């Protein structure tokens, strides 16, 4: 293949002297600008349909704290958390009093687990905040929950609803961090080792969250199952990884489907 310069005024490119404007954009870019609404807004202005959630939903789900507070209003269980701005900071004592240890300190708006630290001691709090503030001006401090980590993908079209088999995540690290995600330091079991009843409950919640938010295209909801089979939502990925070893392709295969057919279904849904 060959490379072509893209004209950002209309997202066109030249191919053998012919100007090509795409009929549809399939977005797979993580973080900014593909996951936070920026690219979606660009395509909205150009009138080019795209594969992901719209501007508002993309921006909402990219802000971890805002998403948690929003879904809490619909009865979705999430970890106790607080938001800290870079200008104000927070003392070690306040973190311990309000959230406790261990806890997670993470950028409020960032992808791929960059800048996330599991904090176990008072001495780790400020260095963890500094690392998170390098990625985002707002940082979420979140209570630690011990349990089984899960990931569950879903997509819906006008004619179809597909909730994929669930993946169980067993990280070799303290949590499912960047190295676990991209360097193979994790064991992923699809379908997850759950009872049929718990499997159904997780999948029903994934479908409900999809509808509550008004999602579009494939999304992945991450959970942790704590004592008493309590389902806690961790975060939502509106442009989940699509490499051969990523969760969604694994779940597609486990469902007996082909990723090409799934993507075609999403694209054709717009034109139908």
Where do the PLM segments sit?
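Hydrophobic beta-strand scaffold residues
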Residues: 49-50, 78, 103, 259
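Short small-residue beta-strand/loop micro-motif enriched in glycine and branched aliphatics
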Residues: 51-52, 112-113, 187-190, 244-248
């Amino acid at each position: 293949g060959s490379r072509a310069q893209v004209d950002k005024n209309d997202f066109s490119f030249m191919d053998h002297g012919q100007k090509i404007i795409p009929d549809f954009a399939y977005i797979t870019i993580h973080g900014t600008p593909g996951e936070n609404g920026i690219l979606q807004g660009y395509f909205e202005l150009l009138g080019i349909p795209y594969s992901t959630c719209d501007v508002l939903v993309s921006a909402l789900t990219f802000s971890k704290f805002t998403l948690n507070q929003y879904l809490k209003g619909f009865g979705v269980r999430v970890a106790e958390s607080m938001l800290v701005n870079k200008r104000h900071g927070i003392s070690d004592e306040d973190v311990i009093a309000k959230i406790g240890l261990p806890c997670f300190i993470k950028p409020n708006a960032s992808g791929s687990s960059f800048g996330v630290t599991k904090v176990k001691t008072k001495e780790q709090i400020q260095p963890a905040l500094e690392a998170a503030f390098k990625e985002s001006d707002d940082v979420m401090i979140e209570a630690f929950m011990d349990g089984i980590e899960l990931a569950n993908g879903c997509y819906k079209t006008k004619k179809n609803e597909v909730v994929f088999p669930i993946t169980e995540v067993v990280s070799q690290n303290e949590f499912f961090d960047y190295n676990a995600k991209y360097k193979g330091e994790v064991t992923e079991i699809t379908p997850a080792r759950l009872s049929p009843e718990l499997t159904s409950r997780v999948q029903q919640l994934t479908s409900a969250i999809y509808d509550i938010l008004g999602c579009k295209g494939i999304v992945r909801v991450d959970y942790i199952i704590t004592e008493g089979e309590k389902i806690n939502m961790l975060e939502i990925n509106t442009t989940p990884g699509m490499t051969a070893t990523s969760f969604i392709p694994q779940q597609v295969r486990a469902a007996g489907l082909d990723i090409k057919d799934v993507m075609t279904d999403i694209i054709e849904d717009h034109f139908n």
